[in-house]
Design a protein with these regions (language model features):
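Bacterial N-terminal signal peptides
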Residues: 7-16
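Hydrophobic alpha-helical segments
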Residues: 16-17, 266
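N-proximal, solvent-exposed segments at the start of the mature chain
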Residues: 48-52, 135-276
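N-terminal hydrophobic alpha-helix used for membrane targeting or insertion
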Residues: 9, 57, 108, 155-156
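Positively charged n-region of N-terminal signal peptides that target proteins for export
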Residues: 1-4
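A residue-level signal for beta-strand positions that form part of recognition/binding surfaces
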Residues: 10, 25, 55, 182, ...
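Metal-centered catalytic cores of metalloenzymes
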Residues: 18-72, 76-139, 255, 275-276
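Generic hydrophobic/packing signal
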Residues: 9, 122, 148-152
């Protein structure tokens, strides 16, 4: 396909996905206020649309302000422009969370078009101290392949929602694993290198035929037990550190399965999830 057509197709696909978005994110800074407030306080928002009733479940976490917060809202306007309040949000002074009223079709269209922002007002900056333009979040995707266990199934990884400094935890799930066994979640920041190893790395050399290592590990995963159906999940803490935004996490499950192969382990496919 010619480069120009490929670029055009990519733009169309991105627009189509945004028009159907159900998960949203924003990073709040003083620089996004109009005019800029000069505040160094940061904030992060995550939000999920309930498509059944058109409500939004939101969570906004902010740092410490010099003066007390007085209000927080969702507004309608493009980046760089001030706009009217659409919905007032509840909570504070550090965490705002709740569920909105049902959105109208026009409000939902504006949200998906990037025409909403969230801001927090303080007594020092009554017009707004920090602001974040809301955009569709990038949801986790799987990659690679796992290897079959003694139950004739291949363990599968999944991610619930997306990792964000505004959320307490990011849930990583496992299905199709050996039942009532031990599962270990590796989580790192690379899918191409694990120390001196180039990934994906063929694990047949250590007795795991058809299995591959798909990510590195920085020690933020852990171990758990699978249930009678071979399922499990791991809550992974994402601390409120806005500097983490933009980092991509890579994960893979390893499951104890003594008769599956010589080493007695199987593993899942990989999960790629961007902190946002």
């Amino acid at each position: 396909m010619p480069r120009s057509l490929l670029t055009f197709a990519t733009i169309l696909l991105a627009g189509a996905l945004a028009a159907q978005a159900t998960h949203f994110t924003a990073t709040l800074t003083g620089a996004q206020e109009v005019p800029p407030s000069g505040s160094t306080t940061l904030g992060q928002m995550s939000m999920i649309l309930d498509t059944g009733n058109s409500t939004l479940a939101y969570r906004v976490v902010v740092g410490k302000f010099a003066t007390a917060p007085t209000a927080a809202h969702f507004h309608r306007a493009a980046a760089g422009v001030n706009g009217p309040v659409v919905i007032a949000i509840t909570g504070g002074p550090s965490i705002y969370s709740g569920i909105t009223r049902a959105l109208t079709a026009a409000e939902l269209a504006d949200l998906r078009a990037g025409l909403w922002y969230v801001n927090v007002h303080t007594s020092q900056f009554p017009g707004g101290e920090i602001r974040g333009q809301i955009s569709a979040a990038t949801l986790p995707v799987t990659y690679g392949a796992g290897c079959m266990g003694s139950n004739a199934k291949i363990p599968a990884i999944s991610g619930r929602d997306f990792p964000s400094p505004s959320n307490a935890v990011f849930q990583v799930g496992l299905t199709n694993a050996k039942e009532s066994s031990i599962a270990v979640l590796l989580m790192g920041v690379s899918k191409t290198q694990y120390g001196a190893l180039v990934l994906p790395f063929d694990l047949s050399i250590i007795g795991m035929p058809t299995c591959k290592a798909l990510c590195d590990d920085i020690g933020i995963g852990g171990s758990t037990a699978t249930d009678a159906n071979g399922a499990a999940f791991m809550p992974v803490l994402i601390p409120f550190q806005p500097a983490l935004v933009g980092i991509t996490l890579y994960s893979q499950w390893y499951v104890v399965d003594p008769v599956a192969n010589l080493l007695g382990l199987t593993n899942s496919n990989g999960l790629e999830a961007k902190i946002q």
